[in-house]
Amino acid sequence: MLDVYSGSVHAVDELAYAAIALVDAGHPRAEAADLLAKKYADHPEVTAEDINDCFDDIEELKADGKLFAEDIYADHAFDFKNRSTVVKALCLHVAHTCNLNCEYCFAAQGKFHGQSGLMSFETGKRALDFLVEHSGTRHNLEVDFFGGEPLMNFEVCKQLVAYARSIEKEKGKNFRFTLTTNGIGITDEVIEWANKECYNVVLSLDGRKEVNDRFRKDIAGRGSYDRIVPKFQQLVKARGGKGYYMRGTFTHYNTDFTNDLFHMADDLGFDELSMEPVVSKAGSPEALTEADLPILFDQYELLAKDMLRREKAGHPITFYHYMIDLAHGPCIYKRISGCGSGTEYMAVTPWGDLYPCHQFVGDPDYKLGDIWNGVTNTELRDEFKLCNVYARPDCKDCWARLYCAGGCAANALHATGDIHGVYEYGCEVFRKRIECALMIKVAESLDPELAGRAATAAPATDEDCGDCSSCE
């Protein structure tokens, strides 16, 4: 049982669940106890003392702020339009071109429905300077080499990292680079560079060969699996434990996506995994449907149970969407406002234009400005400042609202025409993932062996609030 505002998760039996439900419905203690006594009259194992102890526990948890906690977040949401404009991360589109032609790609072969192009070193350098200039006192700055396919502009990627390293000490910053790649352009040089300079790498693979090659093809229509898998394996092996993710997309054609995850884990040797539902126009052959949802829910449950099995066997895998920290979770600000697109996080095109994130690139209505003049469309930025869970009435009664912070603005726009809208299909999937993530945590806490391992895991120490004062 999840207490929404405290974030506490309680493992309860049937009696406790019924007691909490009665309290939640407004029944006084004596009345609720009488109702439970009648309900369990034919269950001699449930005594009056058990019922009394149950309500004692409920009152103690309420007093400790771990059950029926009050909403302490709403007061932080109303003034978001006046929050700071510190920028902490950039998605650098170093290449608006690609050496694959994935049929489900929202970026239209990396061109984002515009012209192809490569970012120059001068433009990239100015983008890094823009980030430093607008980062305030924040120390850690995130930069993702993105596209298109960023390795089609590898020399500029190398030059930009070298430039960033040359100014880190002087500016008091630490640049953390991520490379997102389809793998076609990986070479020994790329592997050496990425494993030295990149805090994380994101490797695009949809799973089984036939699944991957259905959509992830080159211009000639040839599948990419056989060319990229050996390169990915070589890169991951050489990383020596540094961060990476296998990032797949599942569609209507592989709603059995756990088989793709298990293939990557068992057959290919990858243990850091992510799988995202395709976002396509309704009616597209690959688009997920309402009829797919029960299948997807079963798949997420199957994955969660299998992850527990693997953990007990000493061969755990990580699934990105099940990574949840109940003891050291996000701060209030992040719980409310999410990813920070359009404010703290922006995408930069090869020509230096600024957009709220990569999914808005190419839409003139969502151009924020450029890296030379900064954010000139301040009205649009103010709209993104207001993107938070309390700005979405449809989120009001959702138990998962403080885990998604209102969801993705781009998905909301594409589904409803409004960045403050709600992409309901995505909500259904998200809630199921959080449910499974919480189940894993509860199962770990109830298993002595797994609980011991969890207790020895280091808490997150990567928080860098910089100039953010939203929690104060």
Predicted regions located by residue number:
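Long, charge-rich, low-complexity alpha-helical segments
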Residues: S8-C91
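Detector for the c-type heme attachment site
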Residues: C105-K111, G241, W399-A400, L413
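Short, small/polar residue-rich loop motifs at catalytic or cofactor-binding pockets
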Residues: C339-G342
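Canonical Radical SAM [4Fe-4S] cluster-binding loop centered on the CxxxCxxC motif
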Residues: S84-T85, A89-E122
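C-terminal accessory region of radical SAM enzymes
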Residues: P294-H328, H358-A405
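Long, K/E/R/D-enriched contiguous segments that form extended
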Residues: T258-I332
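Radical SAM enzyme core and accessory elements
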Residues: M1-Y17, L22, G26-E31, L35-V46, ...
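Radical SAM/AdoMet-radical enzyme domain recognition
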Residues: G124, L128-D144, N153-V278
